[in-house]
């Protein structure tokens, strides 16, 4: 069981916010790929489970999330993407989540967000961070290859559909999602792009997204989708909400946001959603990790796109 003890040591190291060696990243990504390649585009997840939104490289706040929500493997987690970019510790954040996935594959589910993309990470921080911390782009390459293997969505007990962004005019059924070839860079348009980029909007039908990708979708679209697929609700992330979570359309869509004091300046709280075995909901609200627990690195300029 040398592999397990190696993994446990790497997890311990990453929990201390210490980097693992480039050769270890390569091996970790190879193991992760073997696990992720078996997962469906609509990955089945059993309750009880704790559902989390965007993390964005806020490593010490991810540790705070585990402090309030429980550690893996005692708690079963589903993370809805956007592990990287904007925060100071995208490398440590993503590698920790990946190491936990390899160590406890049935206790943590990772699905893809719009930032799990080569193009986006070259603009919003992860690429530069890999270069700065490892001295080359090799680690970024290993990680972005893994992004292509991440599932596009999950379904909890057949009743709660979880996706990073939202719905697509090209998709009416979960089976249509299952047929997408996901092992690629996030396209600029089309169903795979929409799942990762779309947002709910207080309207009916479909609207043009101000993000330049995906769509705005209304309450009638959600009602049709939920009925067609016999699901109770859609759970998604992708949008900052100051209270940590927000209901839309008469509690048929839920936004969960898990990066407190986003970008170290927004002043928002974060939330995670605990679902018990009967899918009863309990929200845990938490604030940013206290200052004394973090080593804040020198502030680096980031592109000021703020969505």
From Swiss-Prot:
Mn(2+) 1 binds at residues 54, 56, 82. The active site is at residue 115. GO terms for biological process: regulation of double-strand break repair via homologous recombination. SUPFAM superfamilies: Metallo-dependent phosphatases. Keywords: Acetylation, Cytoplasm, Cytoskeleton, Hydrolase, Manganese, Metal-binding, Methylation, Nucleus, Protein phosphatase. InterPro entries: Calcineurin-like_PHP_ApaH (IPR004843), Metallo-depent_PP-like (IPR029052), PPA2-like (IPR047129), Ser/Thr-sp_prot-phosphatase (IPR006186). It comes from the Eukaryota. It is found in: Cytoplasm; Nucleus; Cytoplasm, Cytoskeleton, Microtubule organizing center, Centrosome. Methylation at the C-terminal Leu-307 is critical for interactions with regulatory subunits and functions in DNA repair. The modification Leucine methyl ester is found at residue 307. One of its GO terms (cellular component) is nucleus. It catalyses: O-phospho-L-seryl-[protein] + H2O = L-seryl-[protein] + phosphate; O-phospho-L-threonyl-[protein] + H2O = L-threonyl-[protein] + phosphate. Its cofactor is Mn(2+). Its EC number is 3.1.3.16. Its main location: cytoplasm. Mn(2+) 2 binds at residues 82, 114, 164, 238. The modification N-acetylalanine is found at residue 2. CDD domains: MPP_PP2A_PP4_PP6. Gene3D superfamilies: 3.60.21.10. Pfam families: Metallophos. It is an enzyme of class 3 (hydrolase). Belongs to the PPP phosphatase family. PP-4 (PP-X) subfamily. Protein phosphatase that is involved in many processes such as microtubule organization at centrosomes, maturation of spliceosomal snRNPs, apoptosis, DNA repair, tumor necrosis factor (TNF)-alpha signaling, activation of c-Jun N-terminal kinase MAPK8, regulation of histone acetylation, DNA damage checkpoint signaling, NF-kappa-B activation and cell migration. The PPP4C-PPP4R1 PP4 complex may play a role in dephosphorylation and regulation of HDAC3. This is Serine/threonine-protein phosphatase 4 catalytic subunit. It comes from Oryctolagus cuniculus.
